[in-house]
Amino acid sequence: MKLVLASNNRGKLAELQAMLAPLGVQLIPQAELGVGEAEEPFHTFVENALAKARFASAHTGLPALADDAGLCVQAFGGQPGVQTAYYATQFGYDKGDANNVRALLEQMQGIDDRRAAMVSTLVAVRSPQDPEPLIAVGRVAGEIARAPRGTGGFGFDPVMVLPAFGKTFAELPPEVKNAHSHRGRSSRQMLELMREHWFAGTSER
């Protein structure tokens, strides 16, 4: 089954393709089909993910999967939230993972409450008008490190510490990260939702 991924983020593509492999799903980045980025005007992950999935499906005629994910910092009242990808631009930096990490650490200087959560909301639709979108939410709580650690992953992985391991996501092997990450959790939920709603009574492939 071909499924359009409403994202051009290579990190997301690799993680989601690996986690949905048991279904025989082939994820195709929307850019490969000539689809641009959808607007994300909403204040919640689920609304933005649904908008992106519908947009990708409408422009390709294929089922679509969208992921809206972000970092929610306790000391910032849950921000940057849906603005996570553009966090650095608020402080005069160009958009990008390294600048996001730099800006976050600068803004958290002198803050002792390092609690934060990474949230991934996956939405899948069979068509733009699908009345029953599949929605899966994964959340993992941790703490923001005081300096980047590790070389793996992407986004805020170098500063998101998982207390159970005492390591950042970027310090963990990919298979360990995927087993415990927010996207890993939402992907496992989505896998079961697709099996139940889309592939029930079929051989899945």
From Swiss-Prot:
<dbReference type="GO" id="GO:0036220">
    <property type="term" value="F:ITP diphosphatase activity"/>
</dbReference>
<feature type="binding site">
    <location>
        <begin position="154"/>
        <end position="157"/>
    </location>
    <ligand>
        <name>substrate</name>
    </ligand>
</feature>
<feature type="binding site">
    <location>
        <position position="69"/>
    </location>
    <ligand>
        <name>substrate</name>
    </ligand>
</feature>
<feature type="binding site">
    <location>
        <begin position="182"/>
        <end position="183"/>
    </location>
    <ligand>
        <name>substrate</name>
    </ligand>
</feature>
<keyword id="KW-0547">Nucleotide-binding</keyword>
<dbReference type="GO" id="GO:0017111">
    <property type="term" value="F:ribonucleoside triphosphate phosphatase activity"/>
</dbReference>
<comment type="function">
    <text>Pyrophosphatase that catalyzes the hydrolysis of nucleoside triphosphates to their monophosphate derivatives, with a high preference for the non-canonical purine nucleotides XTP (xanthosine triphosphate), dITP (deoxyinosine triphosphate) and ITP. Seems to function as a house-cleaning enzyme that removes non-canonical purine nucleotides from the nucleotide pool, thus preventing their incorporation into DNA/RNA and avoiding chromosomal lesions.</text>
</comment>
<dbReference type="GO" id="GO:0035870">
    <property type="term" value="F:dITP diphosphatase activity"/>
</dbReference>
<feature type="binding site">
    <location>
        <position position="68"/>
    </location>
    <ligand>
        <name>Mg(2+)</name>
    </ligand>
</feature>
<keyword id="KW-0460">Magnesium</keyword>
<dbReference type="InterPro" id="IPR020922">
    <property type="entry name" value="dITP/XTP_pyrophosphatase"/>
</dbReference>
<dbReference type="GO" id="GO:0000166">
    <property type="term" value="F:nucleotide binding"/>
</dbReference>
<comment type="similarity">
    <text>Belongs to the HAM1 NTPase family.</text>
</comment>
<dbReference type="InterPro" id="IPR029001">
    <property type="entry name" value="ITPase-like_fam"/>
</dbReference>
<dbReference type="GO" id="GO:0046872">
    <property type="term" value="F:metal ion binding"/>
</dbReference>
<keyword id="KW-0378">Hydrolase</keyword>
<feature type="binding site">
    <location>
        <begin position="7"/>
        <end position="12"/>
    </location>
    <ligand>
        <name>substrate</name>
    </ligand>
</feature>
<feature type="active site" description="Proton acceptor">
    <location>
        <position position="68"/>
    </location>
</feature>
<dbReference type="GO" id="GO:0005829">
    <property type="term" value="C:cytosol"/>
</dbReference>
<feature type="binding site">
    <location>
        <position position="39"/>
    </location>
    <ligand>
        <name>Mg(2+)</name>
    </ligand>
</feature>
<comment type="subunit">
    <text>Homodimer.</text>
</comment>
<dbReference type="GO" id="GO:0036222">
    <property type="term" value="F:XTP diphosphatase activity"/>
</dbReference>
<dbReference type="InterPro" id="IPR002637">
    <property type="entry name" value="RdgB/HAM1"/>
</dbReference>
<protein>
    <recommendedName>
        <fullName>dITP/XTP pyrophosphatase</fullName>
        <ecNumber>3.6.1.66</ecNumber>
    </recommendedName>
</protein>
<keyword id="KW-0479">Metal-binding</keyword>
<dbReference type="GO" id="GO:0009117">
    <property type="term" value="P:nucleotide metabolic process"/>
</dbReference>
<feature type="binding site">
    <location>
        <position position="177"/>
    </location>
    <ligand>
        <name>substrate</name>
    </ligand>
</feature>
<keyword id="KW-0546">Nucleotide metabolism</keyword>
<dbReference type="GO" id="GO:0009146">
    <property type="term" value="P:purine nucleoside triphosphate catabolic process"/>
</dbReference>
<dbReference type="Pfam" id="PF01725">
    <property type="entry name" value="Ham1p_like"/>
</dbReference>
